[in-house]
Amino acid sequence: MTNIRKTHPLMKIINHSLIDLPAPSNISAWWNFGSLLGLCLGIQIITGLFLAMHYTSDTLTAFSSVTHICRDVNYGWIIRYMHANGASMFFICLFLHVGRGIYYGSYTYSETWNIGILLLFAVMATAFMGYVLPWGQMSFWGATVITNLLSAIPYIGTDLVQWIWGGFSVDKATLTRFFAFHFILPFIITALVMVHLLFLHETGSNNPTGIISDADKIPFHPYYTIKDALGFLLMISLLLTLVLFSPDLLGDPDNYTPANPLNTPPHIKPEWYFLFAYAILRSIPNKLGGVLALVLSIAILAAMPLLHTSKQRSMMFRPISQTLFWILVADLFTLTWIGGQPVEHPFIIIGQLASFLYFFLILVLMPASSLIENKLLKW
């Protein structure tokens, strides 16, 4: 009799995705981040669900409801900090996952890549709205500053901002709708993840060499299930260390002050994972230009398959491209640092140079270096 996992309509899908899936024999730990992102999403949905049971999305009670969760709800403090720091782990895994895709040329699977970009936008939107919910000073002013950027859109800008706010400023209506969107978006993200995997399984995984590996495949289970389990263990250990020893390390002290529309914090800045994009936004003196640069800082990833000029897929055997890739990584660290600094000399000029270098590397230097490497192949 045939095994039920190979015949049952539902089990068959799971079997083809997680058990009998043919996988390349040489994929490294950089391929662990996809499953780690799935784990992060699961942690965020579960902890978020329990937080939503106790949270109230009203300007008068939101801040105290979060305090109540931490003080009075059984294990509320760990649920709250798992959720807050889980977001940081989510973005660490996201950045590493995207970086892996760029380094090893995974973006040539353009459908999978484009769904991935949509996922990145969706996760960023979710994280932004989640940051508004505790209704601290940085929540309120972050929401005010970022939503206000839409007013830069010609003709419809002001109306659009007021429509999103549900009034003439960030207030009760804004908080309520942000809570509603923050609740629904993770489920939309889950659906997009399934589409992402559907497209990935149409082609199969890439591998570090970038060479087609159809001749040498191994079953996903047990080889990669155990490898993923090790990744899970390491990531949960890191997350729990952060939550139990220094839960506020990555947060902003201003968010422990209840929101006050009459008192602006001296430095308005988002969470650390948005600082690179915030630095790019601030580096352009024009409001509309800044907003466009902000969107393009992520949307530029969609141009990656079009800008691939190399005859090789992966950067594994391309030293010039490797050097430029690591310069790009260093540039992103620089932008992250600048995003957290005040707008004054010398940070302004450093931010402008780093922002220029970011786009110049992706649009000009990396495609050009690939062409040079193509020539070097003939030597």
From Swiss-Prot:
* TM spans (from-to): 33-53, 77-98, 113-133, 178-198, 226-246, 288-308, 320-340, 347-367
Q: Name one GO biological process term.
A: mitochondrial electron transport, ubiquinol to cytochrome c
Q: Which cofactor does it need?
A: heme b
Q: What GO MF annotations does this protein's record show? A: metal ion binding; ubiquinol-cytochrome-c reductase activity
Q: How is the cofactor bound?
A: Binds 2 heme b groups non-covalently.
Q: Which GO terms describe its cellular component?
A: mitochondrial inner membrane; respiratory chain complex III
Ligand binding (heme b b562) = 83, 182
Enumerate the subcellular locations listed in this protein's record, separating them with semicolons: Mitochondrion inner membrane
Q: Which UniProt keywords apply?
A: Electron transport, Heme, Iron, Membrane, Metal-binding, Mitochondrion, Mitochondrion inner membrane, Respiratory chain, Transmembrane, Transmembrane helix, Transport, Ubiquinone
Task: Detail which positions bind a ubiquinone.
Answer: 201
Sequence positions that bind heme b b566: 97, 196
What InterPro entries does the record point to?
Answer: Cyt_b/b6_C, Cyt_b/b6_C_sf, Cyt_b/b6_N, Cytb/b6-like_sf, Cytochrome_b, Cytochrome_b_C_euk/bac, Cytochrome_b_N_euk/bac, Di-haem_cyt_TM
Say yes or no: keyword Hydrolase present: no
Question: Main location per UniProt?
Answer: mitochondrion
Matches recorded under Pfam families: Cytochrom_B_C, Cytochrome_B
Report how it sits in the membrane. Answer: Multi-pass membrane protein
Provide the family line: Belongs to the cytochrome b family.
Q: How is the subunit organization of this protein annotated in UniProt?
A: The cytochrome bc1 complex contains 11 subunits: 3 respiratory subunits (MT-CYB, CYC1 and UQCRFS1), 2 core proteins (UQCRC1 and UQCRC2) and 6 low-molecular weight proteins (UQCRH/QCR6, UQCRB/QCR7, UQCRQ/QCR8, UQCR10/QCR9, UQCR11/QCR10 and a cleavage product of UQCRFS1). This cytochrome bc1 complex then forms a dimer.
Q: Quote the function comment for this protein.
A: Component of the ubiquinol-cytochrome c reductase complex (complex III or cytochrome b-c1 complex) that is part of the mitochondrial respiratory chain. The b-c1 complex mediates electron transfer from ubiquinol to cytochrome c. Contributes to the generation of a proton gradient across the mitochondrial membrane that is then used for ATP synthesis.
Q: By what name is this protein known?
A: Cytochrome b
